[in-house]
Amino acid sequence: MSDFLLNPFSEIAEVSVGQHFYWQLGSYEVHGQVLLVSWFVLAVIFGLSFVGNSNLKSTPDGLQNFTEFVTEFIRDLAKTQIGEEEYLKWVPYLGTVFLFIFVSNWSGALLPWALIELPNGELAAPTNDINTTVALALLTSISYFYAGIRKKGLRYFNRYVQPAAFLLPINVLEDFTKPLSLSFRLFGNILADELVVGVLVSLVPLIIPIPIMLLGCFTSAIQALVFATLAGAYIGEAVEDHH
């Protein structure tokens, strides 16, 4: 009886985040599972985009209707966060970031990657790897620096001493905390969702984990929206005129 009671807790103790599948490139080790699943995610996005727009109709239906809805949603998000003057040139970037994170998160929540056997390690959602989320956050940082310098030139750096020069250290620190908060928020939420589902599946394999998985799909979509919204807000802040 005691073994029966203790067994679920021993299974919980064995729940892990997952082992990385490494590729050796010279002296460097690359997380192969991130690249493999990222290619799958990009193939899904490109495939749906191609099929949805290969035979355009004046009255959209089916997949074309869905792709137009997504495009309008991202366009409105960019317009709200960046402003009417600058938003159009940033719709492709925000759309790419949003769709990549969204499909990556859902691939981890819905697809049984652990069932695919590899020589070592296992497949998982790209956003389950801190390297992916940091890379996305750094791309966003580069984007808003580029947006600000492209519009204002070197005057962009005046923001570090506005409205007062003593705020320089705080404004510089803010440029480091933005990518950190973006990357760790996304990584932490996806990691926590996978751990919770893993614990529940080890305790009660049927029925009970399903609502948690559905909740995970919802929070995964929210995380993609939050990341894209904040990316747009940072770009909008960089290009806005300060008087």
Swiss-Prot record:
| Descriptive protein name | ATP synthase subunit a, chloroplastic
Family note = Belongs to the ATPase A chain family.
The coding gene here is atpI
Its transmembrane ranges are 32-52, 96-116, 129-149, 195-215, 216-236
Q: Where in the cell is it found?
A: Plastid, Chloroplast thylakoid membrane
Assigned GO CC terms: chloroplast thylakoid membrane; plasma membrane; proton-transporting ATP synthase complex
User: What's the source species for this entry?
Assistant: Tetradesmus obliquus (Green alga)
**Role according to the record:** Key component of the proton channel; it plays a direct role in the translocation of protons across the membrane.
Q: Which Pfam families match?
A: ATP-synt_A (PF00119)
Query: Which key words tag this protein in UniProt?
Result: ATP synthesis, CF(0), Chloroplast, Hydrogen ion transport, Ion transport, Membrane, Plastid, Thylakoid, Transmembrane, Transmembrane helix, Transport
Q: How does it sit in the membrane?
A: Multi-pass membrane protein
A GO molecular function held by the record = proton-transporting ATP synthase activity, rotational mechanism
User: How does the annotation summarize its subunit structure?
Assistant: F-type ATPases have 2 components, CF(1) - the catalytic core - and CF(0) - the membrane proton channel. CF(1) has five subunits: alpha(3), beta(3), gamma(1), delta(1), epsilon(1). CF(0) has four main subunits: a, b, b' and c.
Show the taxonomic lineage. Answer: Eukaryota, Viridiplantae, Chlorophyta, core chlorophytes, Chlorophyceae
